[in-house]
Each structure stands twice: as C-alpha cells, then as structure tokens.
C-alpha cells in the first residue's frame, strides 16, 4: 500500500497485516491511497482519493460518510475484490453445457490448483486464482462419445471482472469400413462357377449322347 500527496510523492508505504494502519501528522491537502500489489486471490483495488482539512477532518472522494476507527480517528477503507473465473464446457454443435468431463486448472509450475467434473452449469472459481497470472485448462477425461479437447491457456483478469473460459468438445467421428473387394477372389469364384457349368453341361451332353446310340 502507498499513500501519495498531491505532488505524487510517497508519504507512507506499508504491507497490510489485517489491522488498521495509522498515519499520523498528515498536513492538510489532497492524498491518494494506492494498492500496489493485491494478496493472492484478489484484484488490485481502485485508488481512493481523500482530502485532509486544516482541522484534521477527512473527506473521501465520492463517499458521503467517512467511517471512524474505535478511537475516533477518521478511517479510509479500501476493499479488495476477489478474482472470479467462470469455466464452461460445451458441446461444439449445440453450445449447451456438457456434463461428465473431468477438467483441471494447472498453474505455470504444473500444479493442479482446481479439479472437477463438468455439470449442466458452468464451473465458478472465486478467490483462488491469482490476478494477472496465466493458467492452463486441461480436459483429462471426455464424456462418452466425445473427443478430448485441446488445452486452453488463459489469464485471470486483474480488473475485478469475471474471466470467462469456454472449452468445446466434439463428438467422436464414426468410423466406416470402406468396401475393399478382392478381384482375385472374385475371379476365382467366377472361374469355379464356370468350371462347374462346363462339367454339368458335359455330363448332360454325354448322357444324351448315350441315350441315342
């Protein structure tokens, strides 16, 4: 966290620890509270501008009422929002959610940070992935009748908006066996049939010949 005066000079800098940070003896003037780095699972908060008058009163920009701490000191509150990622597994033809796929989110070090089986609703991950970091969506098992999809790389939005990732599955193509006729076998069959016809015809002629002798 940093506190800057109207000239952009840093008048105080600290790392939050879960307790209120106290800044004393601030001269009258305009100030900006900035978050330089957010904790993992959170996005960097919007800057807060406030003014301190000569009496020590604090007016926060766009805030009607200023909070006070337990000891009565003016309190400027900065709230961090969580990272939000929505992952959808869909049929590429219908665009409908596809249940039964086993999916993983993997970080750049190869660690599996989230694992689940898809359902009829998109999968939502909140406050677990790090803003601005790249992850890989991997399908390890596809639903029956579908092909495993290619991996998808995505980066978590750092502005507080929902990062939407869609992975499509295609149906496994049906394999048809083409007809591969064996010409040699066909010729042999026809030759045998022809030979049988010749033998039968010869027998008939022979028998007829004997009958009239």
Where in the sequence are the language-model features?
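Solvent-exposed loop/turn and edge beta-strand elements of beta-rich ligand-binding domains
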Residues: 1-213
């Amino acid at each position: 966290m940093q506190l800057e005066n109207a000239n952009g000079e840093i008048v105080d800098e600290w790392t939050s620890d879960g307790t209120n940070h106290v800044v004393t003896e601030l001269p009258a003037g305009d100030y900006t509270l900035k978050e330089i780095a957010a904790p993992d699972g959170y996005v960097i908060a919007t800057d807060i501008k406030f003014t301190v008058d000569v009496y020590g009163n604090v007016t926060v920009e766009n805030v009607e009422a200023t909070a006070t701490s337990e000891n009565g000191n003016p309190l400027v509150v900065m709230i961090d929002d969580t990272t939000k990622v929505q992952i959808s597994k869909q049929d590429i033809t219908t665009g409908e959610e596809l249940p039964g796929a086993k999916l993983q989110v993997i970080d750049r070090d190869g660690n599996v940070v989230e694992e689940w089986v898809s359902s009829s609703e998109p999968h939502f991950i909140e406050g677990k992935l790090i803003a601005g970091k790249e992850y890989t969506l991997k399908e390890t098992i596809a639903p029956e009748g579908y092909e495993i999809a290619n991996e998808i790389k995505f980066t978590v939005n750092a502005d507080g908006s929902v990062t939407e990732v869609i992975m499509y599955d295609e149906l496994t193509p049906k394999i048809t066996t083409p007809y591969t006729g064996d010409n040699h076998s066909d010729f042999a069959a026809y030759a045998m049939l022809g030979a049988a016809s010749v033998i039968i015809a010869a027998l008939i002629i022979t028998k007829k010949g004997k009958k009239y002798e």
